[in-house]
Amino acid sequence: MKKLTLYISACISLFAGAAVAEDQIEEVVVLGEVLFQDQINSLKTPTPVINVPQSVVVVSSEEITRRGFTSIGDIVNHVPGLNTSQGEGHRDAVVFRGVRSTADFFLDGFRDDVQYYRPLYNLEQVEVLKGPNALLFGRGGTGGVINRVTKKGSLGENFTDLGAAADTFGGVSLQIDRNMSANETSAFRVNAHYESLENHRDFFDGDQIGFNPTAKFKLSEATVLDLSYEYIDQERFIDRGIPTGTDGRPVRALRETVFGDPLLNTTELEANLFKALVQHRFSDGIKGNLSVFYGDYDKLYQNFYAAKYNQAETPNEVTLDGYVDTTQRENFQISGNVITEFQTANATHTLLFGVEFIDTASDQDRFNTYFDTSESDKETFSISEGLPLALVGGRGTNSEGQATVNDFTLKLNDDTHVEIEARSMYLQDEIQLSEKFIAVVGARYDEFDIKVNNVKSADIRNRKDGEVSPRAGLIYKPQENTSIYLSYSESFLPRSGEQFANINGDKNQLDPDTFENLELGIKWNVNEALSLSASVFEIDKKSPQVADSDPSTLDVIESSIDGFEVQIQGQLNAKWSINASYGYLDGEQVNRSGNTGLRPRELPENTISLWTSYQLTPKFGLGLGASYQDESFINNSNSATLPSYTRIDAAAYYEVSEDLMIQLHVENVSDRVYFPNAHSTHQASVGEEVNARLSVQWTL
C-alpha cells in the first residue's frame, strides 16, 4: 500500500509540476494546436499517423459496421502481418508478425490481459500497433498490441443509434448507443448489446451481454472528466477443432465431427470494469492526464479435445484429454502523463513523460480429466463419421465398449495464487529537426515484481526484474503527405509468461526474454481520402539463459522473423472504396545448438486481403472481397500443416433514408472447406460454411 501511495503521489505530482511550469514558459513559442487533436489513443501523444515511425492500422466504428465485423478475429484477418490462432475456443489469440499472444490487448490504453473474446459493441476504433514497443505499453507486446478505444459521452448532442442483426445459422444480436446531454458541460452515454451465438458446428451455441454506461463532465474550460463502468457476461461452447492425419493436415472426412462433450465443453466469463480519466490543459503548450482502472474478472473454461489420433493404424478411434480451468483476477492500474511542446534553437519538441503502476492479484487452478476406466486423464473413443462421440455430460462408452465416467475434481494439476506489482516510468521526445526531418527518441524503465504461490507443490517463488526498453526513430518527409522512416524498438517478457502461472527456471534466476524490432517504412497520403503504406521489418527474440533441469526452458529459445507489408485503403473516387493488403513473413527457429532449419509455427509466408465496395446509386451499393492465407505449420516441429485457403465474401448496402441503413453480408460465398487456424497438432479449426447476415442500423 505504501508503494501504491507513492505512485499515486507521483502521478499527481506530474500535474503539480506542470502547473508550476506554466508560469515559466513565457519564452516558449505557442504551438499548442496539435496538442489537442489526438490522432491515436494508444500513442499517448497527438501525433498524426503519417509521422509515426511504426506500422499502425486504425479501424473505425464505421468500418466495423460497414464490413460486418463481429470479433477481434474478423479485424485481424484483414491486417497485413497478423493472423489468428485458435485460442482453444475460448479466447482471442493473435499472431503478431509471427509471435502468438493471448494477452497483448488493451482497453483505452489499460492492460486487458485476461483471456476472453472481446466485444466490439462500444468501440470508437480499434488500433493495431505492430512490432515490440515497450515504451508505450510496458512488458509484453512482443509482436505488437491491439488497443480498443471505447465510445465516450459527447457534449451538446442527443442521439440514439439502434442496431439489429440475424444470420442464417440462427444467431441474432441487438445493440443500442444512446447519448444524452442536458447542457454543454455534461453528457451521459449508454452502450449495450445482446448476442445469441450460433455457427455451422454441432452443439455450438452461446450468448453474450455487454452494458457500458459512461459520463463526461466539463469541469472547467481546461479540465474534462470521463467515467465509465462496463459489465460483460459471456457463455459459449468450446470447439477445439479436428485432428490431423498421416499427411499432417486436418482430416477433411472428420470435419462434421465435434471432438468434445456437448454439455461440458463450455466457457463462462463475468467481468466488471471501472475507468476514470481526467484530462487537464495547463496552457497552450502543456497538457496532462491521470487515468485509473479497476477490473474484476471471473473466468471458467472446461473442455475435452483430441489429444491423439493415428489415421494409419486406428482411423476410427481418437484419444481425448481435457481439463477445467478457473481464473479470478483483480487488476488495478493507475497512470499519468504530461505532454509539453516547446522550442530549442531551431527544433520543436513534443516531450512525453509518464508513470504507471499496476497491482494484479490472480488465482488460477486447473483440474485434469480423470476417467475411471483408464484411471488417467485420457480415454479412447470410437469415431463414426458424421456422428457425435459417445460422451455426454462426462459419461460415455469408450472404444472397447466399456461405460466410462469422467471426474473433474480428482486430479489437481495446478493451484496458484499470484501477486504482481509493476512500476514504470517513461520519457519520449519527438523532435521536429527541420521541415523534412523528425526524430523520436525515448526509453522506459519497468520494474516487475511477482510472487507465485503454488499450493499443490507447496512452492513459493519470487522474482523481480528491472528492464530498460529504448525506442528510436528517424522520419524523412520529402513532402508534407509522404514520410519515410527507420525505427528501432524493444520489449521484454518475464519468464513467468503472459499469464504468469509460474516462474520458470531453477532458483528463479532466468532473465526475461527480449524482443527487438528494426523497421523501415513509407507512408503516403495520396489525397485526403486515400493512403498507402509499406514496411520491411525484422523481429528477433532472445532468451539469455536456459536451465538444464527445467524442460520448459529448453524448447525454442530464440527466433528471427523477417517480413514485408503493404496496404492501400480509402476512396478511389466518390463512389469506389478499397482496402487491400499483402503480407510476407519468413522466419527461423534457433535452439542451443544453433539454427534448427525449422520454421516457426503459425507463420504463413503470404497473406492477401482485398475488400472493395462501389456505390451503384446514391442509396444502393455492393461490396466484394477475398482473403488468402498461405499454408503454415501448426507446431514448431513442423510435422503438422494448415493448408492454404482463399475465402470470398460479398455485401450489399441499401440506405432507406438518412436514418435507416440495411446491410447484407455473405461470408464464404463459394462454400469452400477451409481451416483458418489451430492450437496444436490435433486441434485444427473448421472454417464457417457459406452464411449470410442481415443487419439494420437506425438513428433516432
Predicted regions and their residues:
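Acidic/polar loop-and-plug regions of large Gram-negative outer-membrane beta-barrel proteins
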Residues: 195-199, 211-281, 294-329, 374-413, ...
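Acidic, small-polar-rich N-terminal luminal/periplasmic segments of exported/outer-membrane proteins
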Residues: 23-157, 520
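Structural signature of Gram-negative outer-membrane beta-barrels, strongest in the C-terminal barrel
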Residues: 218-220, 329, 348-350, 356-360, ...
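Outer-membrane beta-barrel translocator/receptor signature
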Residues: 121-124, 135-213, 219-223
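Face-selective signature of the C-terminal outer-membrane beta-barrel domain
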Residues: 274-296, 321-453, 571, 579
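C-terminal beta-signal and adjacent terminal beta-strands/loops
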Residues: 630-635, 653-700
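Gram-negative outer-membrane beta-barrel transporters
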Residues: 436, 536-540, 555-637, 670-673, ...
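Membrane-embedded beta-barrel scaffold of Gram-negative outer-membrane proteins
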Residues: 277-303, 477, 483-485, 511-590, ...
